[in-house]
A protein has these predicted regions:
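Intrinsically disordered, low-complexity acidic segments that are enriched in bulky aromatics
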Residues: 1-201, 229
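Short helix/strand-capping turn motifs
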Residues: 168, 178-265
């Protein structure tokens, strides 16, 4: 994975790291128009500062620095999406990248601190209403970004911290229907396959196949991406891989050789 660091007010990408990955923060957000998101090529060429999405990168860099973290990761610009092999590797690794992050910052582009007074009970109700209605809870990719990290913090567009996954646990449970133990990082394999699919059933993705691909980490599955295959075919492939994985896990030879695992799938 590549990471970002901020030096002299400029953002710089690391080499593609395989091992000895330093501590890092990671951003969770909803994408705006493609033309307004900062890309890998923008960072390589030193362009893109006039794009709306640049503000999210500035926020992530500043918050990481406050938390004592030198490095951070943002999906729009840390992956070279023109390279299909790299994109496939990244999507198959993304659950683990979020899981391994020291902190995950959720940037809520549709919640502004200017719309409420911190000490006003009425405004607090308005803030919670906006939180429950946030687009972030409707997107496919943000499901694993909620479940995988140990630390998930929510921020307004101005960078004001609203709370974290634990302090907002009840609201998140009510919004998403996800069981509280799953929000607390119980092993996802403890939850029925159909229950995990239900967590995503109302969520949307820009590319229809991504509805299946965004669930790979939720099920601990690795499979190639075939954009153009359609959602139904991608889901069938995913279900087939899940069934095969469950069969392997049930074989006596596999069970005898199993060791206790600390990974969350």
């Amino acid at each position: 994975m590549r990471l970002l660091e901020c030096s002299d007010g400029k953002f710089k990408l690391t080499d593609d790291l395989v091992r000895d990955i330093p501590r890092y923060a990671i951003l969770s957000h909803t994408w705006g128009p493609d033309t307004e998101e900062v890309t890998f090529r923008d960072l390589v060429d030193g362009t893109g500062e006039d794009k709306t999405g640049y503000e999210k990168i500035r926020f992530c860099a500043a918050q990481a620095r406050r938390d004592g973290l030198r490095y951070f990761w943002v999906d729009t610009c840390c992956i070279d999406k023109s390279n299909n092999n790299e994109l496939s590797r990244a999507i198959n690794s993304m659950f683990r990248w979020y899981q391994d992050a020291d902190r995950c910052y959720v940037y809520l582009s549709d919640i502004s601190a200017s719309s409420y007074e911190e000490d006003s009970q009425q405004s607090e109700l308005a803030w919670e209403s906006a939180f429950r209605a946030s687009k972030w809870f409707t997107r496919g990719w943000t499901l694993q970004e909620l479940l995988a990290p140990a630390s998930v913090e929510f921020f307004t567009t101005e960078g004001r911290r609203l709370g974290d996954k634990r302090s907002l646990e009840q609201q998140i449970h009510e919004i998403t229907g996800i069981a509280v133990p799953a929000l607390r990082r119980s092993a996802l394999a403890q939850f029925d396959v159909e229950e995990r699919f239900r967590w995503a059933e109302t969520r949307q993705t820009t590319h229809e196949e991504d509805w299946a691909y965004c669930l790979l980490g939720i099920f601990g599955i690795f499979m190639p991406l075939i954009y153009g295959e359609g959602k139904a075919h991608a889901v069938r492939r995913l279900r087939r891989e899940i069934t095969e994985a469950m069969k392997r896990d049930d074989t006596p030879s596999h069970q005898e050789g199993m060791l206790p695992t600390l990974f969350f799938f």
